[in-house]
Amino acid sequence: MREAVSKTTTVGLVTGDYVVLAADKRATAGPMVYHKAVKKISKITDYAALTISGLVADAQYIVENARYIAREYEIEMGGPIPIKALASRISLILSVYLRYSPFIVQLLLGGRDSTGASLYYMDLYGSVTREKYMATGSGSPVAFGILEKNYRSDLSLEEAKKLAFNAVSSAIMRDGFSGEGVDIVVIGPGIYSEETIPLKKTIESS
């Protein structure tokens, strides 16, 4: 059985100089929950992270390649890879494999470089778009609705974290395949922070 994290909820949003990523922690294999503490936000560098939704093996391959691309760029160019360039390289991998064995993934790449904070959405076809906010996974209709209703470009960092949390926790309450708590990552000027909010607190806040 191929393990999947497509039945999930991940969100990302940009506010000022920060990007906030959030995801639930449950992973499924068919109708079964096989893990309740999965990290669906993978650190690529100290200034970039990738959320994953899709087949676990495919997502892990993309994450490892993204890390390699970022390290290679830093060695060759002597500085951090621009987030747009990293998104383009990841989308190229997706599109190259599309004709042979496509990666079953949806990805959100969030990060900060010399141009500021940014968020990119990529699908299995290799298409890439820059977004102010986005959601992926089975809980995305609920999460996106929350983001669309409440997002503002001038949100404070705390407001942005709360909105990301509310988007995922709302999806957890309505989507049987999302759950087990919320991971939140914040990337900003000199900052890469991670925190986990347990399921009990998630339910109490809803």
From Swiss-Prot:
One of its GO terms (biological process) is proteasomal protein catabolic process. Residues 1-7 form a propeptide. Component of the proteasome core, a large protease complex with broad specificity involved in protein degradation. The active site is at 8 (nucleophile). Keywords: Autocatalytic cleavage, Cytoplasm, Hydrolase, Protease, Proteasome, Threonine protease, Zymogen. Belongs to the peptidase T1B family. It catalyses: Cleavage of peptide bonds with very broad specificity. Its EC number is 3.4.25.1. The 20S proteasome core is composed of 14 alpha and 14 beta subunits that assemble into four stacked heptameric rings, resulting in a barrel-shaped structure. The two inner rings, each composed of seven catalytic beta subunits, are sandwiched by two outer rings, each composed of seven alpha subunits. The catalytic chamber with the active sites is on the inside of the barrel. Has a gated structure, the ends of the cylinder being occluded by the N-termini of the alpha-subunits. Is capped at one or both ends by the proteasome regulatory ATPase, PAN. One of its GO terms (molecular function) is threonine-type endopeptidase activity. Gene3D superfamilies: Glutamine Phosphoribosylpyrophosphate, subunit 1, domain 1 (3.60.20.10). InterPro entries: Ntn_hydrolases_N, Pept_T1A_Psome_bsu_arc, Pept_T1A_subB, Proteasome_sua/b, Proteasome_suB-type. This is Proteasome subunit beta 2. PANTHER family: ATP-DEPENDENT PROTEASE SUBUNIT HSLV, METALLOPROTEASE TLDD. It is found in: Cytoplasm. One of its GO terms (cellular component) is cytoplasm. It comes from the Archaea. The formation of the proteasomal ATPase PAN-20S proteasome complex, via the docking of the C-termini of PAN into the intersubunit pockets in the alpha-rings, triggers opening of the gate for substrate entry. Interconversion between the open-gate and close-gate conformations leads to a dynamic regulation of the 20S proteasome proteolysis activity.
